[in-house]
Swiss-Prot record:
Function of the molecule: Inward rectifier potassium channels are characterized by a greater tendency to allow potassium to flow into the cell rather than out of it. Their voltage dependence is regulated by the concentration of extracellular potassium; as external potassium is raised, the voltage range of the channel opening shifts to more positive voltages. The inward rectification is mainly due to the blockage of outward current by internal magnesium. Can be blocked by external barium. Probably participates in establishing action potential waveform and excitability of neuronal and muscle tissues.
Quaternary structure note: Homotetramer. Homomultimeric and heteromultimeric association with KCNJ4/Kir2.3, resulting in an enhanced G-protein-induced current. Associates, via its PDZ-recognition domain, with a complex containing LIN7A, LIN7B, LIN7C, DLG1, CASK and APBA1.
Residues covered by region (Disordered): 386-427
Principal localisation: membrane
The protein's name in its UniProt record: Inward rectifier potassium channel 2
Species in which this protein is naturally found: Gallus gallus (Chicken)
GO cellular component: membrane; monoatomic ion channel complex; plasma membrane; T-tubule
């Protein structure tokens, strides 16, 4: 127990390293027996970027400006803040200028600009365009300094004051509503929802599974959270039609309801590669040479605003690591659970993962090894226990139990005999 453990597992610490591992033939049974690196002559352009933005540009859209203006509220909510502020300022300035010109024309036609002594003006103290502009601002913003005011001499002036007040209320309601809707958008909530850099393919409960990890960096919950996934690839129909992006649903438990998750700690999403899976006929070598993209989607309601948010990411074929599992991130302490996000994107290699397709595995064309290898998660738990004993100054020789006591620092993800630990999906 006191000896230093050697690292028998390769750790993928970055997306770049993961891509290298995914495209290289590994010598210990992962490759095809030849020291050959599989590369693609044509690499698929990513349809959904890692940050969730769709890599799509629209061209030749007829009457685009008119269509956007017809839905001006959504346009204002979707545009950037700097353009929103420009629209905000221009709307008020133009309305003030318009009604300032109207009051100046009323004064001009009534002869108020000539300053005649016996002439009762339509708007008192308005003898220039500047004065008319200031009166327009005072009317719409209800400042009312008291020097300029409308009189009962001109009914048209009274009507314009009433009309400007109504228009000002409409502008205020529209601008405030657009700003509030833009501020309340759950778009920024996606910044605290993360997907793992790489997806993995490994055995789970005796079946070959595709897995990826999702996490919530906030303590506030995502209500009614659920996940979806689609595989995008090009294909040619039996009639010869070329479909550049054929969308195929990937089952993550919709029928059984396990697609709905309680996202408090990081969770590994599992897709069982069965006969209904689009990955059923893919072996490791086929995966290395494949050209497709898996789009993963996490949806839920923001707890603070009850608005629906959607977080997206994608994995190309060279970002799927065959024969890897994720490092454990959830640990059980004395009175709480601890999540270590430094391990969130890291994976380790599982040497006995079959390299055949799920179909060959189901048809018994590949014989699984019966050798039980010591699981890496158990090694993490044992190492953590040793560190606790060193920190507390308890000598290992004083322990009478041949198995380490895992009560104080259990990894909540892997069974360890003879005292089983709770699995990550059960917490």
């Amino acid at each position: 127990m006191g000896s230093v453990r050697t690292n028998r597992y390769s750790i993928v610490s970055s997306e770049e390293d993961g891509m290298k591992l995914a495209t290289m033939a590994v010598a210990n049974g992962f490759g095809n027996g030849k020291s050959k690196v599989h590369t693609r002559q044509q690499c698929r352009s990513r349809f959904v970027k890692k940050d969730g933005h769709c890599n799509v540009q629209f061209i030749n859209v007829g009457e685009k400006g008119q269509r956007y203006l017809a839905d001006i509220f959504t346009t204002c909510v979707d545009i950037r803040w700097r353009w929103m502020l420009v629209i905000f300022c221009l709307t008020f300035i133009l309305s003030w200028l318009f009604f300032g010109c109207v009051f100046w024309l009323i004064a001009l036609l009534h002869g108020d600009l000539e300053n005649q002594e016996n002439n009762k003006p339509c708007v008192s103290q308005v003898s220039s365009f500047t004065a008319a502009f200031l009166f327009s601002i005072e009317t719409q913003t209800t400042i009312g300094y008291g020097f300029r005011c409308v009189t009962d001499e001109c009914p048209i002036a009274v009507f314009m004051v009433v009309f400007q007040s109504i228009v000002g209320c409409i502008i205020d309601a529209f601008i405030i509503g657009a700003v509030m809707a833009k501020m309340a958008k759950p778009k920024k909530r996606n910044e605290t929802l993360v997907f793992s850099h790489n997806a993995v393919v490994a055995m789970r409960d005796g079946k070959l599974c595709l897995m990826w990890r999702v996490g919530n960096l906030r303590k506030s919950h995502l209500v009614e959270a659920h996940v979806r996934a689609q595989l995008l690839k090009s294909r040619i129909t039996s009639e010869g039609e070329y479909i550049p992006l054929d969308e195929i649903d990937i089952n993550v438990g919709f029928d059984s309801g396990i697609d709905r998750i309680f996202l408090v700690s990081p969770i590994t999403i599992v897709h069982e590669i069965d006969e209904d899976s689009p990955l059923y006929d893919l072996s490791k070598q086929d995966m290395d040479n494949a050209d497709f993209e898996i789009v993963v989607i996490l949806e839920g309601m923001v707890e603070a605003t009850a608005m629906t948010t959607q977080c997206r990411s994608s994995y190309l074929a060279n970002e799927i690591l065959w024969g890897h599992r994720y490092e454990p991130v959830l640990f059980e302490e004395k009175n709480y659970y601890k999540v270590d996000y430094s391990r969130f994107h890291k994976t380790y290699e599982v040497p006995n993962t079959p390299i055949c397709s799920a179909r060959d595995l189901a048809e018994k064309k590949y014989i699984l090894s019966n050798a039980n290898s010591f699981c890496y998660e158990n090694e993490v738990a044992l190492t953590s226990k040793e560190e606790d004993e060193i920190d507390t100054g308890v000598p290992e020789s004083t322990s009478t139990d041949t198995h380490p006591d895992m009560d104080h620092h259990n990894q909540a993800g892997v069974p360890l005999e003879p005292r089983p630990l709770r699995r990550e999906s059960e917490i």
